[in-house]
C-alpha cells in the first residue's frame, strides 16, 4: 500500500461532501435501491451488497425513515428505477489518473457530463481500463483512531481476514480483498460499531505529490464537479497533496 498521507485527499473530499448532505443522501439511497433490486434477496441478512449499503447509509447518518422508504420503494412492483453501474477512467492535468464510479439510469447523459467535466478542467476521458492498472481494487473500512489501540485493531484485522491496516493520527484504515469485504465489515461492525466510512474502491499503488497550489486547486475542482453529479458515487485519484499545499487549501473558506 502507498503511504497514509493520501488520505488527506480523501478527508478533503469528504469535507466537501459533508457540505452537500442532500447529494450524499441521494447517492446512498440510489445504492440501497440498486442493491435491494439486483441482489439475491431484499433481506440484508441474505444480501451482502444491501447490508454494506445500509452500513454506509448509517455511517453518514441517513435518517431511518429515508432508509425504510428506499427499501419499500425497491420492493414495489411499480418501481421502474433501474440503474446501471459504470466506471469511467481518464487523466486529470499533470498525468493524474482518475477513476469515476457511477450508478445511472441514462448512460448517455452521464457519459456526456463526465466527459465535459474532464475537458473543462484540462483532463481527458479515456477508455474503461485505461488507468485502473495504477490502482488496487479493494475494500476500505475506516474508524476514528480512538476506537481502539493500533495493536487491538491489527489483531482484529488478522482475526477477520483483512488484508492490511494503516493507522495515522486520526484514522484506522482497514483494507480487505473485494471478496472478503462483507465478511470483514460485518466483523468490525459487530466489534466496533458503524464505521466512519466503508466502501469497495480503488486505492492508488503509487501517488503523485501535488506541491503547487494552483495545480491542486484545479485538480480538486475537477474532483468536486464530478462528485456533484447525482450519478457519480465516488471518485478516486492517484495523487496526494504536499503538506504545505494541503494546509493552505484547508485554511481557505
From Swiss-Prot:
UniProt xrefs under SUPFAM superfamilies: YebC-like
Main location: cytoplasm
Keywords assigned: Cytoplasm, DNA-binding, Transcription, Transcription regulation
Taxonomy, superkingdom: Bacteria
GO terms assigned for molecular function: DNA binding
Keyword Transcription regulation: yes
Annotated region described as Disordered, given as residue ranges: 1-21
InterPro entries according to UniProt: Integrase-like_N, TACO1_YebC-like_2nd/3rd_dom, TACO1_YebC_N, Transcrip_reg_TACO1-like, Transcrip_reg_TACO1-like_dom3, YebC-like
GO cellular component, one term: cytoplasm
Subcellular localization: Cytoplasm
Keyword Transcription regulation in annotation: yes
Coiled coil: none
GO biological process: regulation of DNA-templated transcription
Family (UniProt): Belongs to the TACO1 family.
HAMAP family, A to Z: Transcrip_reg_TACO1
Protein name, entry field: Probable transcriptional regulatory protein A1G_04400
